[in-house]
């Protein structure tokens, strides 16, 4: 069984080829989280797009809970976590923006994102098993190279921030969908967690469908089968 489950804010759980991947695992301080931290026992890979607290989240504690889990982020961010929080180097999957990294039957890649980040460049994350490809854009504004991300990785699903202020708003995210051209659906994330990023997600859904693409609006805790 393969699925995408939204855990509120930018936290997303992906089950693919027998692996359990969690991206940007903000759980404890996430008012929309439908789960407690112990739900993440048994994860295979923890992906982090950048070092802002609402994306770095509970990564250190999750890695301690799961000694066999691997961290996937830019090497600079990984080494910050090694030096600052004593994350074991054995738990790292070193990478930077570029091509796929093969890991136990799945493929992982980092992409460009336009945002800020103190210890490393911000990124998006691509997860694929060769049959299904998911693109999590991280925190980002709209940028023209999204066309290249779509061309190179050809994602089936695009998870895009729509909350505005710190990232794209719904209107800009619709433009992003038209550049990325997801083969199956676009899914909005990073909205309505707090008042500062409160928007109407139906604006995104309608805009995406008007462009001829599918949009799936998940509630926190909801999942879709891939």
From Swiss-Prot:
MF GO annotations: hydrolase activity
Similarity annotation: Belongs to the UPF0173 family.
Keywords from the UniProt entry: Hydrolase
UniProt KW Lipid biosynthesis keyword: no
Pfam families for this protein: Lactamase_B_2
Taxonomic lineage from the root: Archaea, Thermoproteota, Thermoprotei, Sulfolobales, Sulfolobaceae
Protein's organism: Metallosphaera sedula (strain ATCC 51363 / DSM 5348 / JCM 9185 / NBRC 15509 / TH2)
Stated name of the protein: UPF0173 metal-dependent hydrolase Msed_2125
InterPro entries from the UniProt entry: Metallo-B-lactamas, RibonucZ/Hydroxyglut_hydro, UPF0173, UPF0173_UPF0282_UlaG_hydrolase
RNA-binding is among the record's keywords: no
NCBIfam families (UniProt xref): PRK00685.1
HAMAP family: UPF0173
